[in-house]
């Protein structure tokens, strides 16, 4: 699969491996033209499920496969499948069928269909329900980190190398980098940035 990134100026890679990575998170909703104008020297990389190149694998919806389900003796094909599958609603418990969904579509379990969300179950057969922020820390963060470390090291290395030589703009539909902010969905692009910079949240 061809990697397609956007840059106005190619430039030469610097040899100083100690240069601090330059990674910026921007909204996928912005036009490519406006982003190029704002960051004329940057490499712009789409890391959403709508990316048209290999960087789509960074999407939590992508079926990277073999992902251990936290507190459960099972594996899943995507991070989002785990996140949605372990949700517990007023009218529905966990749904392990989401662990095997590969098409990156219809992965959301909504309150409109199932009633208020009560939390995330701590394991498929667990009795404890986790709050939103706690679930982020115990389910989402370790699952996404596992994917970065076990499935995407070549792409992570590519982002790291490029970002030491020119700014890299990662496009995501969500831009919230604060794990402890319950008001906005967490940006997975911010987790890529944090991982590359060596400060992945725990």
Tell me the role of every PLM-derived stretch.
Residues 16-202:
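Charged, low-complexity intrinsically disordered segments
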Residues 2-6, 12-18:
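Short, positively charged and aromatic/hydrophobic N-terminal segments
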């Amino acid at each position: 699969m061809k990697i397609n990134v956007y840059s106005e100026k190619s430039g030469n890679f610097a040899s100083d491996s100690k240069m601090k990575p330059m990674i910026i998170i921007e909204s996928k909703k912005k036009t490519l033209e406006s982003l190029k104008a704002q960051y004329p020297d940057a490499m712009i990389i789409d890391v959403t499920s709508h990316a048209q190149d290999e960087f789509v694998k960074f999407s939590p919806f992508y079926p990277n496969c073999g992902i251990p389900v936290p507190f459960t003796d099972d594996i899943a094909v995507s991070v989002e499948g785990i996140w949605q599958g372990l949700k517990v609603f007023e009218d529905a418990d966990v749904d392990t069928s989401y662990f095997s969904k590969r098409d990156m579509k219809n992965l959301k379990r909504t309150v409109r269909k199932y009633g208020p969300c009560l939390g995330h179950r701590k394991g498929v057969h667990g009795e404890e329900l986790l709050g939103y922020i706690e679930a982020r820390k115990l389910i989402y963060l370790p699952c996404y980190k596992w994917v970065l470390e076990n499935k995407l090291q070549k792409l992570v290395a590519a982002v790291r190398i490029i970002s030491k030589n020119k700014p890299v703009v990662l496009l995501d539909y969500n831009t919230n980098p604060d794990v402890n902010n319950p008001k906005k969905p967490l940006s997975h692009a911010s987790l890529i940035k944090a991982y590359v910079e060596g400060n992945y949240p725990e």
